[in-house]
Amino acid sequence: QDLENDKEIQHVFVSLHTPFFPNGGHLTDDMWYKGNNEPRPYIAGKAVDKGILERRDELLEILVNQSTKVKALLTGDEHNYAKTFISNATPIYPAEYSLDKIELKRSIWQINNGSAGAPYYAQEKTPWSAMVSNFSTQNVVVLFHVAGKKIKMEVVNPITFELVDELEF
């Protein structure tokens, strides 16, 4: 709440290792486990009561629904670059999921930049594949240019200086 009330802070970028929505290389783990909610995260050596998808949704509730300032989720576990648009229209559950489903109040971008890792991971089919607007196994650097309320993201190959992707939000 302090963050939301602080008028000096306009934009927040949340960086974490594990993608909320993996696209290649980690569909059997990360925050998806091929849609299996049975795996439990561990805190202080003990499994928590809720499954991995439920815990993912709790994070989304905080970062997307309870905050207007979080602009992007920056991840890196997968050895690729992927830009994924997450909204309430994005399919984020397996077909047979019977537990409560989060309703996102706004959209957000997940930017995965694990492209410096090896080996590179190819894109795999997921429920949200249609929401991936760029996927690359090139080495890239992701740059954010912030000017007041405007944010411009540039994704550049650091060897060739080729512009791989860009986004304004």
Model-derived regions: residue spans:
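Metal-dependent phosphoesterase/phosphodiesterase active-site architecture
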Residues: 1-14, 19-27, 40-73, 78-169
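Aromatic- and acidic-residue-enriched segments that line the glycan-binding/catalytic groove
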Residues: 28-36
